[in-house]
Amino acid sequence: MNTKQIKRNAILGILFFLPVTFLLFLYPAKHNYNTLDVLTNGVLDLNGFSSDADAPILLEDHLTVLGFFGMHPIGKHTTASNLKELVYDKFKGFKKFQIVIVLPEGTEEEARTLKAELMKYEELKFWHFVYGSPNSIKAIHQSLNVPDALDANLATDHVYIIDNELSLRGRLDDRTDNELASKKPVYQKASYDAIKVADLKNKMSEDVRVLFTEYRQKRKGNFDSTSRRANDLKGTDE
């Protein structure tokens, strides 16, 4: 066998075994991935809220990015644009995905103006504005049980991930590698600041992807949750 044949066979062997080795490396991760933590159960649904959609807009049975734009939604143009470009455009093709923005009754015209600006290049089929009373909006936000609050206009730049069982998802431990190495105190990530591009691009997009992976594994019957729940941390020194 000449040198050229030896080289050729070696290259073919590498091309054959490299993908197989890569798949074998990934196989354990497929079945032992970390799921997105449940932070709050029993988030209130949107019963009684109105919208421009033909059917009622609800959180249950959907993966929802939930936001509160308050009495002046047009003033949240930057927040909305970031959400559209960094989250909506990435996940709009996934089954049951939606972005829902909660607004006070009486803001319908301003909301339509904002949506028209976002719809310059495409229809936002999975983006919904819903309208309710101030008390109903406060009740929805309070049910999230998060540290950040709505302002006097019932608005916040923070957005939230709600799963199909009406649970708030996020991270029980959002420490960086350096913070872990330094043994900094544990802190959660219950919301994502839509003004900060990095927060949406690097954290929220990743967390939504992880949740869709969880749903896919459940459908295939391969789901084995290794995530920690909020109750698991009670009574620990972590």
Which sequence ranges carry the predicted segments?
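N-terminal targeting signals for export/organelle localization
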Residues: 1-50
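Short active-site neighborhood of thiol/selenol oxidoreductases, capturing the structured segment around
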Residues: 56-83
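Structural beta-sheet core signal
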Residues: 67, 99-101, 161
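Short acidic, S/G/P-rich loop/turn micro-motifs used as interaction or catalytic elements
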Residues: 71-76, 105-109, 176
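Conserved helix-turn-beta segment immediately C-terminal to the redox Cys motif
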Residues: 79-101
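Thiol-based oxidoreductase modules, predominantly thioredoxin-like and allied folds used
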Residues: 95-109, 125-135
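Short, internal strand/loop/helix patches
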Residues: 115-158
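Thiol-/selenol-based redox modules, centered on thioredoxin-like
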Residues: 156-157, 161-238
